[in-house]
Amino acid sequence: MSKSGLSAAIALGLGFCVSAVHAVPTIPEASGWSGHVNLAVGAGGSESNMLASLGSVDLGDDRISSLDEDAGSEDLVMPIVQFEVAYTLGDSATQFYLGNQVADYLNFDLETTLETHLGIRQAIPDIGAVDFSLATTPLATDVWKDPYLVDQRRGDTERTSTGVKISWDDILSTRFEFEWVGKEIELDDEESGTSSSLGLSRAQQRQLRRTGDVDRFTLHYDWQINERHRLVPGIGYTDYQLDGDAMAEDGFALHLKHLYDLGRWRLVTKLSYEDVESDEINPIY
């Protein structure tokens, strides 16, 4: 089964927090400690039959009357903290850091914006800048134990993701950027399709499991048009290697990001298109 999606996002960030928007921020020449904390408020909307809540923000209805029912639209407003503390070894152009990343913050991608990274950056002459980090999402994300439960109150369960991120910026002194992200997704209680009203066999229930691994590869080119405008086209490939064959999918994505510098502010607009194909047909539909 093939699925396509088009999404757009607009974010506005303060100038003091957006000086570094590359996959790997510039490493200072001087040794020592550095860091910053930026506070913001994010607002948006969510339509999902899988997500229950993000932190204290409810994102879905705990009861549905039909499997064909469209997901309700939920508006959300939540604080966003973008921070980093780092220690730099100036002589070797090495930096150790803990925090979340400015590039994710400006992409306005809720999933990656909330990730916290513990990592190391290394600048290598004529090669580029490389970043390796361990990533986790400290804010609890709850999903429905059985999202296919009809005319009953659906219970929620916590979903966690941990993984590794590797970035290579200014590849061979060009303006190309490469990223690979590998994650493991776990649920405390996975009960998809277990309702007796569905009449699914155990084998069919296993096809609906949402746990497993996700690999995402992205290649960008940072085109500096002039002092105020930058255009960043990109191509990506995502492989959802989930335990349920009906939930596993893979496919390619196209991205186009425009950055407009307004002095102390920077306006970021992002357009994405993704086309993915599932391994198996969902046994319910």
Show the residue positions of the predicted features.
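Detector for outer-membrane/organellar transmembrane beta-barrel domains
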Residues: 177-179, 210-281
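Surface-exposed loop and membrane-interface regions of Gram-negative outer-membrane beta-barrel proteins
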Residues: 63, 67-75, 89-129
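Residues on the lipid-exposed face of transmembrane beta-strands in outer-membrane beta-barrel proteins
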Residues: 37, 83-87, 118-122, 164-170, ...
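Outer-membrane beta-barrel translocator/channel fold
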Residues: 42-58, 135-185, 270-285
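Outer-membrane beta-barrel initiation region
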Residues: 24-95
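Transmembrane beta-strands of outer-membrane beta-barrel pores
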Residues: 41-47, 89, 100-106, 134-140, ...
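Outer-envelope beta-barrel architecture signal
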Residues: 29-37, 79, 92-94, 126-130, ...
